[in-house]
C-alpha cells in the first residue's frame, strides 16, 4: 500500500534528524529545539513565544509564511525553545529528496543562531539581531544552511551511484545558475541554491 504523505514526511524527518546529529554536528541537550510539521505554518508560529524582532517580521509577513518550505523561530532567550516549523502544505509537493535537504537546512539555521549567541556571549535573541555583525552572520547562515541542505539533497539523490550524478551534473549547474540570475536581479546574491 502507498504510504500517505504524513507518514512519508515523518519518516524523512526522523531519518534526517538522525543524519544531522550523526554527520553534521553533535547533539547538545542544552539546545532545546522543537521540530513541528504542520498544515498552517503561520498559526503554529503564533502559538510560540518569539523574540520581539522576529515577532515584528512574522506579523509583517503574515500568512505568506504558509507558502514557505519551513522556517526557524527564535524564543526571546536562548534557554527557551527554538522552533523549526515545516510545512505539510508545501513539502508533499516537493521531491522527497528536497524535503531531506530542507530539514537539514532549517536545523543548520537553528544551530547557527545558537552558535552566534554563544559567540556574542548573550542569551537575549533581540540583542543578536542588533549586533554589529548581524548582516554578515545572516549571509553566513544562509550560505551554510544551503550548503548543508543542498549537499544532503545531492548525496541522497545519487546514493545508488555517482554515475547518475555525472550524467546529470550539467542540469544541476544550470539550475544553480538559473537560481542565481533570478535572485541576483533582486539583490539577493546569496540565493545560489
Which role fits each region the language model picked out?
Residues 11-15, 97, 105, 139-143, ...:
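A structural signal for well-ordered alpha-helical segments within the folded catalytic domains
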Residues 53-103, 113:
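Active-site scaffold of zinc-dependent metalloenzymes
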Residues 97-98, 112-143:
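Post-HEXXH active-site segment of zinc metalloproteases
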Residues 135-151, 190-193:
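Short, hydrophobic/amphipathic alpha-helical patches that form generic packing surfaces
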Amino acid at each position: 500500500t502507498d504510504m500517505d504523505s504524513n507518514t512519508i514526511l515523518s519518516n524523512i524527518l526522523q531519518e534526517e534528524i538522525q543524519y544531522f546529529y550523526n554527520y553534521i554536528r553533535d547533539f547538545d541537550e542544552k539546545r532545546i529545539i522543537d521540530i513541528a510539521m504542520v498544515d498552517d505554518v503561520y498559526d503554529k508560529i503564533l502559538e510560540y513565544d518569539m523574540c520581539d524582532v522576529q515577532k515584528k517580521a512574522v506579523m509583517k509577513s503574515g500568512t505568506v509564511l504558509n507558502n514557505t518550505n519551513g522556517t526557524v523561530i527564535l524564543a526571546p532567550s536562548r534557554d527557551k525553545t527554538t522552533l523549526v516549523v515545516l510545512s505539510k502544505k508545501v513539502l508533499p509537493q516537493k521531491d522527497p529528496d528536497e524535503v531531506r535537504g530542507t530539514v537539514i537546512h532549517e536545523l543548520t539555521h537553528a544551530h547557527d543562531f545558537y552558535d552566534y549567541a554563544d559567540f556574542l556571549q548573550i542569551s537575549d535573541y533581540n540583542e543578536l539581531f542588533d549586533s554589529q555583525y548581524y548582516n554578515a552572520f545572516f549571509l553566513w547562515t544562509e550560505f551554510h544552511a544551503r550548503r548543508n541542505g543542498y549537499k544532503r539533497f545531492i548525496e541522497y539523490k545519487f546514493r545508488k551511484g555517482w554515475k547518475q550524478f555525472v550524467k546529470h551534473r550539467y542540469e544541476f549547474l544550470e539550475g544553480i545558475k538559473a537560481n542565481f540570475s533570478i535572485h541576483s536581479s533582486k539583490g539577493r546574491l546569496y540565493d545560489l541554491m
